Design a protein with these regions (language model features):
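Asp/Glu-rich intrinsically disordered low-complexity tracts
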Residues: 2-20
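Long, low-complexity, charge-biased intrinsically disordered regions
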Residues: 158, 258-259, 273, 280, ...
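Surface-exposed beta-loop-beta
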Residues: 263, 267-300, 309
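Catalytic cores of glycan-processing enzymes that make or break glycosidic bonds
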Residues: 25-32, 41
Length: 488
């Protein structure tokens, strides 16, 4: 009986094998095409498809900067970007933008998107940061207590042309270098090195197994890969400070004990201020739907904290004037965890996507857009990253002071700015490779330095334009045409 059963099973298996072999010989697949997965056999070569795009958009074309005659002037652009912000804080924002040309660039993502929409693009889309300037890279903590180097600001993230991020990074490096006192050759070389590192890293990722490329983490290997050894000392110092930059340290400096137990924020105007009870209650109540946006495995962690206080806190340069709160949580031992609840405004580049031939996405919730964009671009993201709505406005929620640290690119020595450029260029390539096939972008970028030189030429030209825009803003402030509060 057992022998007969075994024989029957063997015959059946042989029949299946013969059927599979026959189907394969006739070009018939045993399995159907599965939605969400790559087709088999592969259809075409992404590398060759990317290479073919050079015929329509030569790599040298990226040096082109032709400003639209209808381009808004700097003062009008700043005033327009202030719309919808808290009016009492817009002078502070203008004052920060007027500090230097690099600061102006940081606050004028919308104006640059207007200009970029009129530059050549290949049509390759990916998840882009939308504001990938040199100061938007930094260190932050992962769930295991380690530090990761990556992009760290995604307010403007959207699906768009990869070239826009790379050009914004290159321009910012020129401006940061000039502010640091570097000569023009050094500044131009930094922009060129960023593009070169982007190109080489994309080629490296294109050759790796898909899972290895996806999980490539920025660490010492990245510094070695990008030849950024002169930057190691600076990164170690920043990392040391970042490890101490925690919720506990912030709470120790910014809160006080209250009678009956617990703590509350201590006002430090104009940066940190108390808010009316009704406003604080609205923010606290909005944490309930926020919890629902987290993975179920994270919810028991927050259930071990009580909400003690809410305050308003001014942040950033481009973000000044948006509504941003800090929420103090305390566990059973009185140990703090601080969350940031930050208003999520529409991405500044979205109105310009159609001009570049990209579809304008439907966005059901701006906080959700920011969070999902961040998770797509980063290898490791904040485990408490989520979104909510406060009094009809969308917000993103994240940990505040999660061992964050950053390098000030405008304070780097001349022998470090090119190292920083290579590191950030490589990080940007890794982030873009999550939203687009790296083989496609690598095929377009190629092996030689044609793209690098074009990006450097564009960066210098646009940096010059930004300096003119900055000068126009400073003149308008002096003439009383726009209000500014400098030095805060």
């Amino acid at each position: 009986m057992d022998r007969a059963g075994a024989t029957a099973r063997a015959d059946a298996a042989g029949a299946v094998d013969r059927a599979d072999a026959g189907a394969a010989g006739r070009g018939v697949r045993r399995l159907p095409r599965v939605r969400g997965f790559a087709p088999w056999p592969p259809q075409g070569s992404p590398k060759e498809e990317g290479k073919a795009l050079r015929a329509g958009v030569p790599r040298s074309a990226h040096r082109t900067l032709r400003l639209d005659p209808a381009r808004p002037d700097a003062v009008s652009a700043v005033a327009e970007s202030n719309a919808g912000r808290l009016p009492e804080l817009t002078p502070l924002r203008v004052g920060r933008m007027a500090a230097t040309p690099f600061a102006f660039l940081r606050g004028s993502a919308g104006l640059m998107a207007y200009d970029l929409a009129r530059t050549p693009v290949t049509g390759i889309g990916t998840q882009i940061c939308g504001d990938a300037h040199a100061a938007n890279f930094g260190l932050y903590g992962d769930a295991r207590g380690g530090l990761v180097i990556d992009l760290n600001d995604f307010d403007e993230t959207a699906h768009g042309p990869w070239e826009w991020d790379l050009k914004r990074l290159a321009v910012s490096l020129v401006l940061a270098g000039r502010e640091a006192g570097a000569d023009e050759d050094t500044c131009r070389a930094a922009a060129r090195d960023a593009a070169g590192a982007y190109r080489r890293t994309m080629r490296l990722l294109a050759k790796l197994p898909a899972l290895d490329a996806w999980n490539a983490v920025a660490d010492e290997e990245l510094v070695s890969h990008t030849d950024a050894h002169d930057l190691l000392g600076t990164l170690r110092r920043v990392a040391e400070k970042a490890r101490a930059n925690t919720s506990g340290r912030f709470a120790a400096k910014s809160t006080e004990a209250v009678p009956g137990g617990g703590r509350r924020f201590v006002p430090a105007p104009p940066v940190l201020r108390r808010i009316p009870d009704t406003e604080a209650a609205a923010v606290a109540t909005a944490l309930e739907p926020y919890v629902d946006t987290l993975g179920e495995d994270r919810r028991p962690l927050l259930a071990r904290y009580a909400v003690h206080d809410v305050a308003f806190r001014v942040v950033g340069t481009g973000s000044v004037g948006t509504r941003s709160y800090v929420v103090l949580l305390l566990d059973h031992r009185g140990e703090p965890l601080v969350l940031q609840v930050k208003e999520a405004r529409p991405a500044a580049l979205v109105p310009h996507l159609a001009t570049a031939g990209f579809p304008v996405p439907a966005v059901p919730h701006e906080g959700r857009r920011v969070v999902l964009g961040q998770k797509r671009m980063q290898v490791v993201s904040d485990t408490l990253l989520g979104w909510t709505t406060v009094e009809g406005r969308p917000y993103q929620v994240r940990q505040f002071r999660n061992r964050k640290g950053s390098v000030d690119p405008a304070a780097l020595a001349a022998d470090q700015i090119d190292d920083y450029a290579r590191m950030t260029g490589a990080l940007l390539a890794r982030a873009h490779s999550h939203g687009a096939d790296p083989r496609l972008i690598a095929g377009y970028c190629g092996k030689n330095e044609e793209l690098d030189e074009a990006m450097a030429a564009f960066a210098v030209a646009y940096a010059d334009r930004t300096e003119e825009d900055h000068a126009d803003l400073v003149a308008a402030i002096k003439a009383g045409r726009i209000e500014a509060e400098p030095g805060v």
